Amino acid sequence: MGIAKQSCDCCRVRRVKCDRNKPCNRCIQRNLNCTYLQPLKKRGPKSIRAGSLKKIAEVQMVSMNNNIMAAPVVCKKVPKNLIDQCLRLRLYHDNLYVIWPMLSYDDLHKLLEEKYDDRCAYWFLVSLSAATLSDLQIEIEYEEGVTFTGEQLCTLCMLSRQFFDDLSNSDIFRIMTYYCLHRCYAQFADTRTSYRLSCEAVGLIIKIAGFHREETYEFLPFGEQQLRRKVYYLLLMTERFYAVYIKCVTSLDATIAPPLPEVVTDPRLSLESFLEVIRVFTIPGKCFYDALATNCVDDSCTEDSLKRIRNELHTTSLDIEPWSYGYIDFLFSRHWVRTLAWKLVLHMKGMRMNFLSNTNNTHIPVEIARDMLGDTFLTPKNLYDVHGPGIPMKALEIANALVDVVNKYDHNMKLEAWNVLYDVSKFVFSLKHCNNKMFDRFSTKCQGALITLPISKPLQLNDNSKDEDDIIP
C-alpha cells in the first residue's frame, strides 16, 4: 500500500483530511471506492490573472466622495511592468518633464531596474505614475480588460503611507513622492489634501534635509545637486501659488541658486522654460506673497517696487521653445504675477482712489489681458489641460482685475475694456479643471458691476470638483 502525493478523489470532494493511503482510511470507513484519478495540482503560487488584478485594484480603492476611512492594509505591489509601461510610453518625459522636471526617462528607467525593491524609490515611481496619468487624464491598459487610472494608483499610495511616511528621513524620493501626490489631488480639485501634502514635502525640505541652505549642496555630485534644486524650487512655486489662493504665509525663499541649464539634444528635456518660471515667481520677494496671503502690505512693498515687478515681467525670453507645455506655463505665470503686482497696489492704505483715478494705472489690466489673449491665439488647446487648475485660475485672476476697472473708463475706453473682458471670459470658461464656487464668485462680481458675461456654452467642469469645503477661496 503506497502513499499518494495528494488527497483521494472522495476526500477532495468531501473536503476532509485524507491519509493518502491506497485505499485511504476515510473511504474504508464509509465503504467508498477510493480512487486517485484527478490530475495532481501544481504546488506554489498561482499566476496573477487579469480578473485578480482588477479585483485587487477595486479592493484598494477608497471612496473619495464619501470620505470612507479604511483600516490599514498591506497592499500588493504595483507590478513592475505596469510602471515600466508608463515609462516606455514616455508619458511623463514627453509631456510633463518641462513643467515639473525631476528625473529624465533614462534615469527613471534605471531607477526602476535597480531600485524597484527599495521602499522609497518604489513609492516615488508609483506616485509619479499616478501624477502622470492624472495630469494627462488618461488610463493605461495593463492587460486585456484591466486598466489603471491615476486615481487608483494615488489611492493605493495614500493607503500605503505607513511604508514611506517617515518624517525623520529626508530621502529625496520621499520628498518627491509627496510632491507627486500633491499633483494628483490638485487634479482632483481636492485643495486641502493637495496643500497638506505639499506642506509635508516643504517640512522635509527645511526641517530635515536643510535644502534651503546653500552649504547643504557643497559636497553633493552635480546630478544630485540639480535634482534637489529642481525639487526645492518646484515646492517654492507651489507654496507661493497657494499663498495667493488659500492665504497661507510662505516658508521657502530664494536662498539657494536655481538649477543650472543643462546641455541637451532633446528640447523636451530643456530647463529653459522651467528656469524662466522660477524667475517669474522669484522676481517678487517672499514679502510680496506674504502680503497677498495676509492682505497686509509692509513697507518693503511700495508702488515703485510693484511697478518694477510689472516692468521686469513685460518681455518674454527668446530661448524657450514656443508653443510647448513649458512655454504656456511661463506665459501664464508671467501675466498672473503682473496682475498680482497691480492688485497689491489697490490693497495699499490710501492708494486705491488715487491709483484708480489715474488712467494709465487702470489701463494696465487691459494691457495684460490683451497680451494674454495674443499668447493664446496660436496655442493648441491640449497644451492647457495638463497644467491642472493653475492655468484657469491664473487667467481668472486677470479677468477679475478687468472687472475691477471696467467701469472706471469713459465710454470709448469702457467699450474697449468690455470687449477684452468678453474674449478673456470666453477663454477662461472654455478651460477644464474649474470648480463651481470659484466661477460663481466671478459671475457674482460681474453682476455686482452690472456686467453681463458673454458666455453661451456650459462650463466644462472636472467631475471630481468640490463645491463646499475643499474650494480655493
Curated annotation (Swiss-Prot):
Recorded hits in SMART domains, A to Z, give: GAL4
Q: Where in the cell is it found?
A: Nucleus
A single GO molecular function term of this UniProt record: sequence-specific DNA binding
DNA-binding residues (ranges): 8-34
Q: Which Pfam families match?
A: Zn_clus (PF00172)
Name the domain of life.
Eukaryota
GO cellular component terms, alphabetically, are: nucleus
Q: SUPFAM superfamilies, alphabetically?
A: Zn2/Cys6 DNA-binding domain (SSF57701)
State whether keyword Transferase applies: no
- What is the residue range of the motif Nuclear localization signal? 41-49
Q: Which InterPro entries match?
A: Carb_Metab_Trans_Reg, Maltose_ferment_reg_DNA-bd, Zn2-C6_fun-type_DNA-bd_sf, Zn2Cys6_DnaBD
Principal location: nucleus
Q: Which UniProt keywords apply?
A: Activator, DNA-binding, Maltose metabolism, Metal-binding, Nucleus, Transcription, Transcription regulation, Zinc
Q: What does this protein do?
A: Regulates the coordinate transcription of structural MAL6S (maltase) and MAL6T (maltose permease) genes.
Name of this protein: Maltose fermentation regulatory protein MAL63
Organism name: Saccharomyces cerevisiae (Baker's yeast)
Q: What is the lineage of its organism?
A: Eukaryota, Fungi, Dikarya, Ascomycota, Saccharomycotina
